[in-house]
């Protein structure tokens, strides 16, 4: 009785020990050897069960040191291990790649069975040493199916697929009976070789030997068909599996994802949950990828919660898929929380975050994460580089991009097509076109994305003809253009190349891509910007006519939302087209129609309509749009804010304009330019200069537009020295070559300060021909400062060479002659104007009262209250006449005088 109780106690202790040891090793808390020896001393016994269990756990968890200590204790204790125990010990050494120790154990084994040989073959196969594996295989006295499977798997893992096929053929010749694992391996070979026909032959063998109901073989079959883009066969195999397990469910869900049948993947996942098949690591990863691609944040979040409960959340593959899901569902906040709370982060986790922040246009955060990745010692790969190049493009970080491309060259990853494509895109967006073309030129292999990247780079940098040339080169290289190609090439045609655009439209129709939503929007944009609004509206109406669609309510809702987004882009293009044609009223009417149709405007719509309000000085409508912007919480957008600043200033409301400027959370050079331009336009030169100086202090780099505004402010104030300082600052401090508008402002500054001849010299020193604006500016200042008749005549002659029908040139010169008392020349000019049938451009004024726009032209009697208006103007003119020296209208015919004064 006492002996029985002792044995029972010892058995319970062994079970307890085994359980504790499993927990410690599985949680990476590898116990010290004393834990093992203390137990043996307590039970005062060593057995096959103890050592085999320890060796199995050490092999499973890679605890090599504990395995070695247990091996030493086994020798010291004098325990004579069985073949089974020694096979378990072999597994410890082969799993940890310690083949010296493994060979010693194998050589000293008194009795080897087929399992012993298989352990050595499998170990060498996994270590990419197929020579040694083959040597052991050939020396085996007896081989079983496991031995052959190890060789099959080894050759596959080492990329020697043809060798795997040879082994499979030899198995058949030797009469070895195939099992499910054999078929699983050889079908993986078919997938690797992309040889679906061979896979179908293997399928025939599977059916013939009766393995078609084997879940392992069937799962491999459906995986092979899915990867070979024959999903119908894959689905048929799945439906034929009598008892589906987590492996088969995982294979079919992964197949759906591989074939972009993402909704079906989610459907299978829900069905799997109903039958309680159990969720594996690969299922979590596949379904999370589907959620990411479909922006299914709600389901993705639920799956993450499920993973947390089942302890799968700590798995590296599942964690990376979860991070990627949150990032692609625009939820970087939860992605960052998961990232920060994760232990043992791997490179894939960093890649998911870098890519996510790059896609969310948080370039600086992505760059910081890449720096952390570099510091972590995990290294980088092609995905890391592609993501960080996008980040460099976002922040216009050319210097960072150059350094990172240096890393790509050093690591030979610059040869990767995806990395090269990302680098081309980055250089293009950073305006380093030469570098972009160099990377493109050095590529050994180019795909459609490579051509799209270099074409887009040239289009973004205003190289329209080069873009068209590259498009032709792409076609000659037999690369089929896609929606991204046509998007870039049609943008290149918006600069006036309508003929090319129409030819490309024909190519689009022939290629069958006219129904593509992205291409349709690009066509609408191209025709709108080329001034062919009617053609753009035709395409818009034809493209977005209602179509009969079917699907679930959820799918229909998504399709509807996507279509509304596409329609918004299309409407934006047409509205922008009207603005470019200076038809702001039509643009506003189109915006009203858009709202009536229930299409939600985006920030680009609001910005464009605010531009029309600025053009028409429609402060009322502008304020209504501003209210909508606040309601949709878009006021923090830098683009919207800049447009609001510009709109209020052009409507004469400098107070609200400055208020919007100061409230702006982020100001770029456009915001600063809008405010400075507003002050300059309203003659507030001092405020404009103060704001410009503040802009410099805040390290905002001014551009050409900034200097146009600040020079205009100097012209208003007559600040010749300050104007010259800013003019020379452009090239000296910022590398900006002055353009025609800058010279025009300098002519105005010099002329208004009385230095008319110096202004003429500046025009002659210009590196390019003066335009009509500059000559008209010079002629205008001649009317202010007398005794500059010769300069005025030269300016008039230049203006008439540019446009012989320019009536303003005659009018201004007439005023110069009148101021100089040269009445005969005034009369001659008036006769010439009548002889050439030239008429003064009628003056035009407008005012907005109670949301209604009133427009007035000289001599206009179309307004319903024109009689009251003319009566009031007559009273004002009669009060002005006694104080007017009439020098302005000398030389004008008497019957025209009153009409001129009503302008």
Curated annotation (Swiss-Prot):
Superkingdom of the source species: Eukaryota
BP GO annotations: cytidine to uridine editing; mitochondrial mRNA modification; mRNA processing
Record InterPro entries: E_motif, Pentatricopeptide_rpt, PPR_At4g14850-like_plant, TPR-like_helical_dom_sf
Keywords recorded for this protein, A-Z: Mitochondrion, mRNA processing, Repeat, Transit peptide
Disruption phenotype: Retarded growth, reduced size of leaves and length of petioles.
Chain segment of the transit peptide: 1-31
GO molecular function: RNA binding
Region named Type E motif: 774-850
Gene3D superfamilies reported for this sequence: Tetratricopeptide repeat domain
Region (Type E(+) motif), start-end ranges: 851-881
Any one GO cellular component localisation term in the record: mitochondrion
Compartmental location: Mitochondrion
PPR repeats: 47-81, 82-112, 113-143, 144-178, 179-213, 214-244, 245-279, 280-314, 346-380, 381-415, 416-446, 447-481, 482-515, 516-550, 567-601, 602-636, 637-667, 668-702, 703-738, 739-769
Subunit structure: Interacts with MORF1/RIP8.
Family listed: Belongs to the PPR family. PCMP-E subfamily.
Function: Involved in C-to-U editing of mitochondrial RNA. Required for RNA editing at 8 sites in 6 different mRNAs in mitochondria.
Name of the protein described by the UniProt record: Pentatricopeptide repeat-containing protein At3g02330, mitochondrial
Gene transcribed to yield this protein: PCMP-E90
């Amino acid at each position: 009785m006492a002996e029985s109780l002792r044995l029972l106690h010892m058995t319970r202790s062994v079970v307890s020990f085994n359980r504790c040891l499993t927990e410690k090793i599985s949680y990476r808390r590898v116990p010290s050897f004393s834990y093992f020896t203390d137990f043996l001393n307590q039970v005062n016994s060593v057995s096959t069960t103890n050592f085999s269990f320890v060796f199995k756990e050490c092999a499973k968890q890679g605890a090599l040191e504990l395995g070695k200590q247990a091996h030493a204790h086994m020798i010291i204790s004098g325990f004579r291990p069985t073949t089974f125990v020694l096979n378990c010990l072999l597994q410890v050494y082969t799993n940890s790649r310690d083949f010296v120790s493994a060979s010693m154990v194998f050589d000293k084994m008194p009795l080897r069975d087929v399992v012993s040989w298989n352990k050595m073959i499998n170990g060498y196969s996994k270590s990419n040493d197929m020579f040694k594996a083959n040597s052991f295989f050939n020396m085996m006295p007896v081989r079983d199916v496991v031995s052959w499977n190890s060789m099959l798997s080894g050759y596959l893992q080492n990329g020697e697929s043809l060798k795997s096929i040879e082994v499979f053929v030899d198995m058949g010749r030797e009469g070895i009976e195939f099992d499910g694992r054999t078929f699983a391996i050889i079908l993986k070979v078919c997938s690797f070789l992309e040889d679906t026909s061979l896979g179908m032959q293997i399928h025939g063998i599977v059916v013939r030997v009766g393995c078609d109901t084997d879940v392992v073989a069937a799962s491999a079959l459906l995986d092979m068909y899915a990867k070979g883009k024959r999903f119908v066969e894959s689905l048929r195999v799945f439906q034929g599996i009598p008892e589906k397990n987590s492996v088969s469910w995982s294979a079919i869900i992964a197949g759906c994802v591989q074939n972009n049948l993402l909704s079906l993947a989610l459907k299978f996942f829900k069905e799997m949950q109903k039958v309680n098949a159990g969720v594996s690591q690969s299922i979590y990863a596949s379904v999370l990828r589907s959620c990411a691609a479909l922006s299914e944040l709600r389901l993705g979040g639920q799956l993450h919660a499920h993973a947390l409960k089942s302890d799968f959340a700590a798995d590296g593959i599942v964690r990376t898929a979860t991070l990627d899901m949150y990032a692609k569902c625009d939820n970087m906040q939860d992605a960052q929380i998961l990232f920060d709370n994760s232990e043992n982060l791997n490179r894939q986790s960093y890649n998911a975050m870098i890519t996510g922040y790059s896609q969310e246009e948080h370039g600086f955060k992505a760059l910081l994460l890449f720096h952390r990745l570099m510091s972590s010692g995990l290294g980088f790969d092609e995905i890391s580089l592609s993501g960080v190049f996008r980040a460099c493009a976002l922040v216009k970080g050319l210097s960072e991009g150059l350094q990172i491309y240096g890393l790509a060259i050093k690591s030979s990853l610059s040869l990767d097509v995806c990395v090269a494509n990302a680098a081309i895109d980055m250089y293009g967006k950073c305006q380093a076109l030469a570098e972009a073309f160099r990377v493109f030129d050095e590529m050994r292999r180019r795909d459609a994305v490579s051509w799209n990247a270099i074409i887009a780079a040239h289009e973004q940098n205003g190289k329209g003809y080069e873009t068209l040339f590259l498009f032709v080169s792409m076609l000659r290289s037999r690369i089929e253009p896609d929606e991204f190609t046509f998007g870039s090439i049609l943008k290149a045609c918006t600069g006036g190349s309508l003929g090319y655009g129409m030819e490309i439209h024909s190519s689009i129709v022939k290629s069958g891509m006219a129904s593509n939503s992205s291409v349709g929007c690009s066509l609408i944009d191209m025709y709108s910007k080329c001034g062919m609004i009617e053609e753009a509206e035709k395409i818009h109406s034809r493209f977005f006519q209602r179509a009969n669609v079917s699907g679930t309510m959820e799918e229909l809702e998504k399709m509807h939302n996507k279509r509304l987004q596409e329609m918004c882009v299309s409407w934006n293009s047409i509205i922008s087209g009207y603005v470019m044609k200076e038809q702001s009223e039509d643009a506003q009417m189109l915006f009203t129609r858009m709202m009536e149709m229930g299409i939600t405007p985006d920030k680009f719509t609001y910005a464009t309509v605010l531009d029309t309000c600025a053009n028409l000085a429609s402060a009322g409508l502008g304020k209504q749009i501003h209210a909508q912007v606040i309601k949709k919480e878009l006021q923090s957008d830098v683009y919207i804010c800049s447009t609001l600043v510009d709109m209020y200033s052009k409507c004469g409301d400098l107070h609200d304009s400055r208020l919007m400027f100061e409230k702006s959370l982020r100001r770029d050079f456009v915001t600063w330019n809008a405010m400075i331009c507003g002050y300059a336009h309203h003659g507030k030169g001092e405020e404009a200069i103060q704001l410009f100086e503040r802009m410099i202090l805040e390290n905002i780099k001014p551009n050409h537009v900034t200097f146009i505004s600040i020079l205009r402010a100097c012209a208003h104030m007559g600040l010749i020295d300050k104007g010259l300082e800013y003019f020379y600052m452009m090239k000296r401090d910022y590398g900006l070559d002055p353009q025609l508008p800058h010279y025009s402002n300098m002519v105005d500054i010099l002329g208004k300060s009385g230095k008319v001849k110096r202004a003429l010299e500046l025009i002659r020193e210009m590196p390019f021909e003066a335009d009509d604006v500059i000559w008209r500016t010079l002629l205008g200042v001649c009317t202010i400062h007398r005794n500059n008749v010769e300069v005025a005549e030269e300016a008039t002659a230049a203006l008439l060479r540019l446009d012989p029908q320019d009536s303003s040139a005659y009018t201004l010169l007439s005023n110069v002659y009148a101021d100089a008392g040269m009445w005969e020349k005034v009369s001659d000019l008036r006769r010439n104007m009548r002889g050439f049938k030239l008429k003064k451009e009628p003056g035009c004024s407008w005012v907005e009262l109670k949301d209604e726009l009133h427009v007035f032209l000289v001599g206009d009697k179309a307004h319903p209250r024109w009689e009251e208006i003319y009566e009031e103007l007559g009273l004002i003119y009669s009060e002005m006449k006694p104080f007017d020296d009439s020098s302005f209208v000398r030389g004008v015919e008497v019957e025209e005088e009153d009409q001129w004064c009503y302008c």
